[in-house]
C-alpha cells in the first residue's frame, strides 16, 4: 500500500507540473496575440490631446476671455480633426516645455519650436510648416551692430531657447562672444527690457519681432544670425508611429485646403514694412487723443469690434474731426458727401455723426460681401470696398479667380489688388482702374493699428486687475517672484 501510494503521488505531481507548465506556455503564447493600444488610440480613448505651448503673441494668449494664437488655433484644428478635446498646457519658457515633454506629460508641443540638431536628438518632429529667421535685436538710437564678434554690451536670451543654441554655435567661431540666459523671462519680456534700455541685445524670431514692434517701436533689427530655420511640432520619441503619421496626414490636408495659409495671413500677413515714426506717433495719440472719442466708438460699433472702428478712423483722419483731403472727403471717418447723405450724416465734422455714419457704411459693405467669404475675413473685403468702392473690390475678386487663385481668401485677393492699377488688367474688369495697391496698404495699416489697440487695451485691463489684486491683498506680504508654472502644471496633469 505505501509503495502504491508513493507512485500515485509521484504521478499526480508530474501531471500537476505538466498542467502548470502548459498554462504558463499558453499564457506566454497568448501574450504574442495581445497588442497594446497605440498612442493615437490612447488619445482617442481618453477623449483629449494634451498640447504644450508658450505664452506669447504668436503662440498662445487670452484676449477678451478667448484663447488665441497661431499655434493654439492650429492645435485646436488638429484636435477637432481627431474628434477629441484640446487640453492646452501653457508655460512661460521653452525650458519648461521641454521638461514637460521629456516627462511624458504632453502628447506634443506646439510653440513655434525651431528644429535643430540638438532637439532632433531628443524629440521627434512633425512636418515643417513655416520658416523663421533669428534676429539680433537692439534699441533704436543705439549704435547699430555690424558684426557678431564686435558686440559691446549685454546679450540676454531665454534659457533653453533657440537663441541660446545659436549663440553657443556662434561662439565656436567667435570665442569672445559672451551672453547670459534667463530662465524666468520669456522672449517678449526680454524684448521689453531691450526697448526700455535695461539690456542691450536679445535674439528672437523675425515673426515675434515684427509683431512686438507694433507695441514697442524702439525695437530694431540688428543682425540676421542664421539662414531660415524650420518650425514644427515636437513629440516624444517612441517606436509607435501612430501619432506621427496622423500629424503628417493632418498637415498634408491643411496645406492642400489652404487652412495654414489662412492662419499665416491672419497672424503675420499684416506685419510687414514697419515704420518707427508712424508706430510711435500712433501709440502716443492712442494714449492722448483716443480716450476723448473712445465712448463714441464703443457706442456706434456695429458688426465689428470698437477697436477696429477706432483703427479705421485713425487710418482715415488720425482722429481729427476737421480732417479734409483734396478729394473732398471729411471728418473722423473721411466720408464723401454722397456717402454721408446716404448714411444720414448732416455734419461730417461732428465726431459722433461721422463715427456713426462710418460704422453704418462699414456694416453696409460687410452685408454685401459674398456669403462664400469666410466670416473672419469679411471685414478685410469690406474695408477694401470702404476704401476704393464695392465694385472695384468685386473686380479684384473676379480677377483673382481668373488667375486661378481663391477669390474668397484675403491672402490671394490682396496680392491681386495692385493689378487694378495696370492697364493690361484693369481693361478686363467691369469698373476699370482703381488704386488697388493703396487699398491693400490701407487694409494692412488698419490691421496693424487694430492689433496695437488690442494690445494697449489688454495692458490696461491687466493693470486694472493688478490694482484690484493689490487692494484685496494689501494686508498680506506680496511675492515679487513669478510662480513656477511647471510645478503646478505637472501637479494638475498628474492628478487627472
Curated annotation (Swiss-Prot):
Molecular function per GO: peptidoglycan lytic transglycosylase activity
GO CC annotations on file: cell outer membrane
Region ranges (Disordered): 464-485
Catalysed reactions, as listed in the record: Exolytic cleavage of the (1->4)-beta-glycosidic linkage between N-acetylmuramic acid (MurNAc) and N-acetylglucosamine (GlcNAc) residues in peptidoglycan, from either the reducing or the non-reducing ends of the peptidoglycan chains, with concomitant formation of a 1,6-anhydrobond in the MurNAc residue
Pfam families in UniProt: SBP_bac_3, SLT
Entry annotated with the keyword Signal: yes
Keyword Lipid biosynthesis applies: no
Keywords for the protein's UniProt record, in alphabetical order: Cell outer membrane, Cell wall biogenesis/degradation, Lyase, Membrane, Signal
Region ranges (Non-LT domain): 32-271
Renumbered residue ranges of the record's region LT domain: 273-496
Membrane topology: Peripheral membrane protein
One BP term from GO: peptidoglycan catabolic process
Catalytic residues in the record: 316
Enzyme nomenclature, EC number: 4.2.2.n1
Annotated signal peptide: 1-31
SMART domains: PBPb
Cellular location(s): Cell outer membrane
Matches recorded under CDD domains: MLTF-like (cd13403), PBP2_YfhD_N (cd01009)
Family as reported in the entry's similarity comment: In the N-terminal section; belongs to the bacterial solute-binding protein 3 family. In the C-terminal section; belongs to the transglycosylase Slt family.
HAMAP family: MltF
Domain notes: The N-terminal domain does not have lytic activity and probably modulates enzymatic activity. The C-terminal domain is the catalytic active domain.
Function: Murein-degrading enzyme that degrades murein glycan strands and insoluble, high-molecular weight murein sacculi, with the concomitant formation of a 1,6-anhydromuramoyl product. Lytic transglycosylases (LTs) play an integral role in the metabolism of the peptidoglycan (PG) sacculus. Their lytic action creates space within the PG sacculus to allow for its expansion as well as for the insertion of various structures such as secretion systems and flagella.
Protein name: Membrane-bound lytic murein transglycosylase F
Organism: Aeromonas salmonicida (strain A449)
Amino acid at each position: 500500500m505505501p509503495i502504491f501510494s508513493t507512485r500515485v503521488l509521484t504521478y499526480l505531481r508530474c501531471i500537476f507540473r505538466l498542467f502548470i507548465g502548459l498554462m504558463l506556455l499558453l499564457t506566454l503564447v497568448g501574450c504574442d496575440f495581445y497588442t497594446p493600444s497605440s498612442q493615437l488610440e490612447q488619445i482617442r480613448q481618453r477623449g483629449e490631446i494634451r498640447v504644450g505651448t508658450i505664452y506669447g503673441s504668436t503662440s498662445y494668449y487670452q484676449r477678451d476671455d478667448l484663447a488665441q494664437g497661431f499655434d493654439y488655433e492650429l492645435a485646436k484644428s488638429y484636435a477637432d480633426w481627431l474628434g477629441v478635446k484640446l487640453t492646452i498646457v501653457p508655460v512661460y519658457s521653452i525650458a519648461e516645455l521641454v521638461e514637460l515633454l521629456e516627462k511624458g506629460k504632453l502628447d506634443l508641443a506646439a510653440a513655434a519650436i525651431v528644429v535643430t540638431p540638438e532637439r532632433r536628438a531628443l524629440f521627434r518632429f512633425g512636418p515643417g510648416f513655416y520658416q523663421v529667421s533669428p534676429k539680433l535685436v537692439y534699441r533704436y538710437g543705439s549704435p547699430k551692430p555690424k558684426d557678431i564678434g564686435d558686440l559691446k554690451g549685454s546679450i540676454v536670451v531665454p534659457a533653453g531657447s533657440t537663441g541660446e543654441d545659436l549663440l553657443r554655435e556662434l561662439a565656436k567661431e567667435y570665442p569672445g562672444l559672451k551672453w547670459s540666459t534667463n530662465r524666468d523671462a520669456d522672449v517678449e519680456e526680454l524684448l521689453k527690457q531691450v526697448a526700455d534700455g535695461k539690456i542691450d541685445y536679445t535674439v528672437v524670431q523675425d515673426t515675434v519681432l515684427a509683431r512686438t514692434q507694433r507695441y514697442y517701436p524702439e525695437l530694431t533689427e540688428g543682425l540676421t544670425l542664421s539662414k531660415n530655420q524650420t518650425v514644427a511640432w515636437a513629440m516624444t520619441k517612441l517606436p509607435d508611429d501612430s501619432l506621427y503619421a496622423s500629424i503628417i496626414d493632418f498637415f498634408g490636408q491643411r496645406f492642400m485646403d489652404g487652412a495654414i495659409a489662412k492662419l499665416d495671413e491672419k497672424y503675420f500677413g499684416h506685419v510687414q514694412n514697419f515704420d518707427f515714426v508712424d508706430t510711435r506717433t500712433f501709440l502716443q495719440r492712442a494714449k492722448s487723443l483716443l480716450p476723448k472719442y473712445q465712448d463714441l466708438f464703443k457706442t456706434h460699433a456695429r458688426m465689428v469690434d470698437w477697436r477696429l472702428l477706432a483703427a479705421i478712423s485713425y487710418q482715415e483722419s488720425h482722429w481729427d474731426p476737421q480732417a479734409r483731403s483734396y478729394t473732398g472727403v471729411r471728418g473722423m471717418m473721411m466720408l464723401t458727401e454722397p456717402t454721408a447723405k446716404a448714411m444720414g450724416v448732416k455734419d461730417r465734422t461732428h465726431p459722433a455723426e461721422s463715427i456713426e455714419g462710418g460704422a453704418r457704411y462699414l456694416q453696409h459693405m460687410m452685408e454685401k460681401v459674398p456669403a462664400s467669404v469666410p466670416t473672419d475675413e469679411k471685414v478685410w473685403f469690406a474695408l477694401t470696398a470702404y476704401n476704393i468702392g464695392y465694385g472695384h473690390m468685386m473686380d479684384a475678386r473676379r480677377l483673382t479667380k481668373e488667375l486661378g487663385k481663391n477669390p474668397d481668401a484675403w491672402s490671394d485677393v490682396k496680392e491681386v489688388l495692385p493689378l487694378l492699377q495696370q492697364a493690361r488688367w484693369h481693361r478686363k474688369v467691369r469698373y476699370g482702374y482703381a488704386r488697388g495697391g493703396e487699398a491693400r496698404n490701407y487694409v494692412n495699416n488698419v490691421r496693424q493699428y487694430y492689433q496695437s489697440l488690442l494690445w494697449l487695451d489688454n495692458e490696461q485691463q491687466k493693470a486694472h486687475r493688478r490694482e484690484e489684486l493689490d487692494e484685496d491683498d494689501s494686508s498680506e506680504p506680496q511675492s515679487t517672484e513669478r510662480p513656477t508654472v511647471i510645478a503646478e502644471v505637472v501637479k494638475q496633469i498628474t492628478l487627472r
